[in-house]
């Protein structure tokens, strides 16, 4: 099961061991799960997924502290995808990044999804990110799933009161829309 389902963590700073090189960080799942026969095969898979995640070969020799937040998140994504999972949980995977880097990581995730045929469960509190990346949305309230629908349908016509309140709280650039947030 671990090979087929993987996780991208929220904080790329905390998710990477400062004592390991990027090569070793990405290779670790292959070695722990016994998915390669030797170092050459491991290195080939590491180089392949690093390139797909827009990491240069020179990056593989460095340590995590040498990278920006976006680069660290790409390293985390490479580590997640190196064992070729079918299902990936992205737990607030862009929340710690600034907006321009968020867009870059979201575009990378979408291209990897298309290229590798992945299914993502994208956990986020940022509804603009959810609207951009998700095909289907589920809303939780107090630990309970209260609504689930295709993204456009949920955003255009929410049925649960919490979903309505959540969507009404999204800031608007239209001055006529101010003050319309619903209270629970």
Question: Regions from the language model: what does each represent?
Answer:
Residues 130-132:
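A short, surface-exposed alpha-helical micro-motif characterized by mixed small hydrophobic
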Residues 136, 148:
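Short, glycine/charged-rich "phosphate-handling" switch motifs in NTP-dependent
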């Amino acid at each position: 099961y671990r090979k087929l389902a993987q996780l991208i963590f929220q904080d790329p700073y905390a998710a990477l061991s400062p004592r390991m090189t990027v090569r070793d960080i990405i290779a670790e799942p292959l070695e722990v799960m016994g998915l390669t026969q030797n170092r050459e095969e491991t290195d080939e898979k590491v180089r392949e997924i690093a390139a797909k995640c827009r990491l240069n070969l020179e990056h593989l020799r460095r340590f995590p502290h040498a990278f920006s937040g976006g680069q660290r998140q790409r390293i985390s994504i490479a580590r997640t995808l190196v064992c070729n999972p079918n299902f990936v949980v992205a737990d607030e995977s862009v929340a710690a990044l600034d907006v321009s880097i968020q867009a870059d990581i979201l575009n990378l995730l979408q291209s990897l999804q298309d290229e590798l045929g992945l299914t993502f469960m994208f956990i986020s509190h940022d509804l603009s990110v959810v609207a951009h990346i998700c095909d289907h949305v589920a809303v939780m309230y107090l630990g309970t799933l209260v609504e689930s629908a295709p993204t456009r349908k949920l955003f255009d016509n929410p049925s649960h009161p919490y979903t309505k309140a959540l969507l009404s709280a999204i800031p608007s650039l239209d001055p006529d829309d101010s003050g319309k947030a619903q209270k629970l």
